[in-house]
Amino acid sequence: MTHPVKAAVFGTGSWGTAFAVILADAGCEVTLWGRRAEVAEAINTTHTNPDYLPGIALPDSVRATTDAAEALRGADFAFLVVPSQTLRANLADWAPHLEPDTVLVSLMKGVELGTAELMSEVIADVAKVPADRIAVVSGPNLAKEIAERRPAAAVVACADESVAQRLQAACHTSYFRPYTNTDVVGCELGGAVKNVIGLAVGIADGMGLGDNTKGSLITRGLAETTRLGLAMGADPLTFSGLAGLGDLVATCSSPLSRNHTFGTNLGRGMTLQETIAVTKQTAEGVKSCESVLDLARRHGVDMPITETVVSIVHEGKSPVVAVKELMSRSAKPERR
């Protein structure tokens, strides 16, 4: 008789907690790691996470700890769900406790500042594990809806198809349907760049520019993502799937999206600092827009929407001026 899959989830924010619900419902033994003792205590005693998923009852089988070694003991999978810019430092602390066969799974959607590395590359750098022990999960997965067990689908990607299939089985439930893929780069890029496009659409919504603008930004944003993906060796079909178009549509259309909400506040006239002050959780696109643009320039890829977001968020350009400049670029064929 095989033992239940053991899963460690590193991060007690809304997405980490929601994914712990999926894993528990799929029959895994789940340990949530969190830095704050009071959050771990609340999860263990009240089976809720009042800070990040208030009102959601967690399965009794989900337990929490602040001890990384305890969380990783016997783990088949370690799911990493921290802000992407903190992964390197956090993983350096956790890596000494990894067991030889534990598969590291990124649930993060970002590109590291300075190095322009994808999260899978940061994992490989820090944990010194081969590609068949690194996987990613990506797709249209807004945490609150997942925690409420509303139907959703996602992509689980690993260079080793058999590992992707094991991961698929570990998180397949009646409401969460994962599909396998071996295009790790494509799945990660889809998730990282959609945060930037989500900011752009949010800014446009905050300015009251309308649905034509939104549709144009989503479509041309997907074109930017695909161009970068092709330059990095990704499969272009990945971007028409759940990790590309699916995630992009959810982020650009939902009030639950942190990046869309952040952009909306900027478009309404808030300053960057004012918007940060009213945002409770990390909007990955705020920092990743710079690293995505860095990555694009390293590969010689033109990403004008991303450039526009960077100019508004980090260079103080007026959204009105930025939109005018974006629309005034020289005309060109669509497929470029």
Swiss-Prot record:
Keyword Lipid biosynthesis: yes
Positions annotated to bind NADPH: S14, W15, R35, R36, K109, A143, R258, E284
Enzyme class: oxidoreductase
Disulfide topology: none
Gene Ontology CC, one term: cytosol
Catalytic activity reported: sn-glycerol 3-phosphate + NAD(+) = dihydroxyacetone phosphate + NADH + H(+); sn-glycerol 3-phosphate + NADP(+) = dihydroxyacetone phosphate + NADPH + H(+)
Pfam entry (one): NAD_Gly3P_dh_N
Active site residues per record: K194
UniProt keyword annotations, A-Z: Cytoplasm, Lipid biosynthesis, Lipid metabolism, NAD, NADP, Nucleotide-binding, Oxidoreductase, Phospholipid biosynthesis, Phospholipid metabolism
Pathway the protein acts in: Membrane lipid metabolism; glycerophospholipid metabolism
SUPFAM superfamilies: 6-phosphogluconate dehydrogenase C-terminal domain-like, NAD(P)-binding Rossmann-fold domains
First-listed, main subcellular location of the protein, grouped into a coarse class: cytoplasm
Entry GO MF terms: glycerol-3-phosphate dehydrogenase [NAD(P)+] activity; NAD binding
Superkingdom of origin organism: Bacteria
Annotated sn-glycerol 3-phosphate binding sites: K109, G139, K194, D247, S257, R258, N259
Gene Ontology annotations of biological process type: carbohydrate metabolic process; glycerol-3-phosphate biosynthetic process; glycerol-3-phosphate catabolic process; glycerophospholipid metabolic process; phospholipid biosynthetic process
EC identifiers of the protein: 1.1.1.94
Family listed: Belongs to the NAD-dependent glycerol-3-phosphate dehydrogenase family.
Protein's recorded name: Glycerol-3-phosphate dehydrogenase [NAD(P)+]
